[in-house]
Regions:
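Active-site-adjacent loop and "lid" segments of alpha/beta metabolic enzymes
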Residues: 1-2, 12-53, 58, 68-169
Length: 169
C-alpha cells in the first residue's frame, strides 16, 4: 500500500495496457484501428469506475500506453498518436503521452533506440499539438526548446495574418 495514493488531492495516471495479465509482452496483435477503439473502451470503463469510486473529475490523467503496451505493430501506436484529439474530445480529461525512444518510432524510421532523439522529438511535438497535456520525455531540454520555438513561430504566424487582414477573429 502506498500512502501517497490515499491523498485526496493527488492526481492519478491511468495507463492503457493491451495485455491484461502478467508482464507486458509483444504478443498482442490486431488492426491499428482496434488499438484506438480498445484505448477508448478502456478509458471509458476506467473513467466510469473512477467517478463511481468518488474520484474528483479533474483527478485523473489518461495515458494511452504507446509502443508495445498497445501492440507490437507500429501502425497501432501511429494510429493512436494521430488520433489523440479524438480521444481527448471523447473523454474530456487530460492526456499524458510517452513516445520517447519507443520501438514503434525505430520501426518507422529504421533506426536503433540510441538514434531516436529526432523522431522522439517530432512525435512529442505532434502529441502536444494534437491534445497531449503532458509528455514524458528522455530529453526535457530539447523538448522545451522545440516548444518555445513552435510557440514563437505560432505568434509570428498570427501576427502576420493579423497584419495582412487575414485574422477574422
Amino acid at each position: 500500500r502506498c500512502p501517497d495514493v490515499a491523498v485526496p488531492d493527488c492526481r492519478r495516471v491511468g495507463m492503457q495496457l493491451a495485455q491484461r495479465d502478467g508482464v507486458a509482452t509483444r504478443s498482442v496483435r490486431g488492426r491499428p484501428e482496434d488499438g484506438l477503439d480498445g484505448v477508448g473502451r478502456f478509458f471509458e470503463a476506467l473513467v466510469s469506475a473512477w467517478r463511481r469510486s468518488g474520484g474528483a473529475a479533474d483527478g485523473l490523467i489518461l495515458d494511452p500506453g504507446m509502443g508495445f503496451f498497445l501492440s507490437p505493430a507500429p501502425e497501432t501506436s501511429l494510429h493512436v498518436l494521430s488520433n489523440l484529439q479524438k480521444l481527448k474530445s471523447a473523454l474530456g480529461l487530460p492526456l499524458l503521452v510517452s513516445v520517447s525512444r519507443k520501438s514503434f518510432l525505430g520501426a518507422t524510421v529504421g533506426l536503433p533506440v540510441k538514434d531516436l532523439g529526432p523522431a522522439s522529438l517530432a512525435a512529442e511535438l505532434h502529441a502536444i499539438g494534437n491534445g497531449a497535456d503532458y509528455v514524458r520525455t528522455h530529453a526535457p531540454g530539447d523538448l522545451r526548446s522545440a516548444i518555445t520555438f513552435s510557440e514563437t513561430l505560432a505568434k509570428f504566424r498570427s501576427r502576420d495574418a493579423r497584419d495582412r487582414g487575414l485574422d477574422h477573429a
